[in-house]
Amino acid sequence: MMLDDFIKEFSKDKEKKKKVSDLGNIPHGSEALIISKISEYIKKDILFICENKKKYNQIKDVLNFLEIKNVYFFPEYDTNTYDRISPNKNITSERVKTLIELKFSKGNKIILTTAKASSQFIAEKQSSYYKNLNLETGGEYDLVEIKSFLVEHGYTNTSYVREVGEFAIRGGIIDFYPFNYSSPVRLDFFGNKLDLIKTFDANTQLSHDQNLDDINIYPCDEIILNNELVNNFRSNFNLEFGSESKNSKLYESVSSKITYPGIESWLPFFYNSKSTIIDYCNDPVIILDNSIFEIINDFEETLIAQYKTRIEFDSEKENTEKYYSLSPDQLFLGKEEYRNIVSNHKQLQFSSLKNPKGVNLNANNIQGFYSSDKLNKIDYQSLKNTINKNINDNNSVFLACSSEGSRLRLSKIFKNQNIDSYLFDKFSDLQNINKKGIGICVLNLSNGFFLEKTMFISEQDIFGEKFYRSRKVENKNFLKDLSSINPGDFIIHVDHGLGKFINLTNLKIENSYHECLMLEYRNNDRLYLPVENLEMLSKYNSDNENIILDKLGSNVW
């Protein structure tokens, strides 16, 4: 079925409220285009729930690339629930910004999140705890109040601002680094008058030339340590764990309005009631991957195992050293409750497979242009024929590269292969470009697809999977050589998650021996990784004494 035909039928069918529709044969990477198309027809909020962070990041990139309006992002934490580590401030800041804007935004919206994030309890929608501070050039402001806002809303006072979530005050100058800016911001006051707003270089500390007219400061943390919320926490904590818990480091830190590492694991104690991101949406149509409920089941199993380990840990510790964990059902929706809440909304389930009983989209994945049996053998003639055929059929053809360097390299290769191409940065650029051939852009797309009149080819489609590396991954986090890890160290595999390095071993594969790293996962499952693929691992550092390994084959990671 053509996408437009399906959307018209889906949007007109009022009786499908609280029922599920299925749409199959959806190529990986095309979800953002489909969501944006659906939003044009359905005059309601759309909540898209991704199966994992990897898919979330890819769809987020494509939505930004398409410059879709009224899109909001609610990512999951980059930490395990019971770790004594707080999430990255870029993540918490973006979550709070989304919660603030969802409360006051008008019109239809697209909200992107993940299975784990959508099941997590957050501050009630009716609360007024989350606020943003708007400052304008020429306005009069109290510097003490600005400092109080920054401290209360999660910014850390430092000598020099270099990282997101930091601020510094020197006389009439306030520097701070909000997550929604690529550079830190400098406020230059003359008395109480805000003279200048500029961004500046975090390394040199030198201001950039361009002035800003105004700036919106959003909180960096989801937990605001003001008097009301601290009192809420103290009351709930005492009620749950008794008077002896007052001696714990967590209780003392919060009582003193000092952020405690991993404080997000007690987030529900700070608020009078709990909500989820679903509650922040206005009677949304929920679009979700068809594996979401299975992922929620696996996630609940993981949480229960982590919680039991924490309880065992607490039983051997003094009151001051106990973790005082909240149970999984205090932090997240259980699998049955999650299913019931989602079922109260009109649903559309996406599947990459063809649905024999449902509706299937008229779309295709791109077949690779490389030879699997010949290293680095690219079939450029086939690539050229595919591009030319689609252009002759009046289809739009684009190539998504993983980096600017890749884009320049591929444009040179195309020139040598007599393949017409042009460069562009975002979708709106296409209106002002003399388009001839294939358009080349930088976009986080691991697989290409053809959807009606649009074809995207990915870098991986040309060079193969082993040569592709997502631009989202910072190479500095990967292990460079075997001397970087020792037996017993915890590692994170880019595909399989948290495991433990056991030792090196030689495996006989097809009559030859290969040196491999033996990695252990939950239930003593083993994964053998060839040493030449060492870059797929990064070292995991945590002060958590009871680390729960990920489960091989689970959808949670």
Residue ranges with predicted function:
Residues 1-544:
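Conserved beta-alpha structural segments and adjacent helices that either
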Residues 541-557:
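Long, low-complexity intrinsically disordered regions
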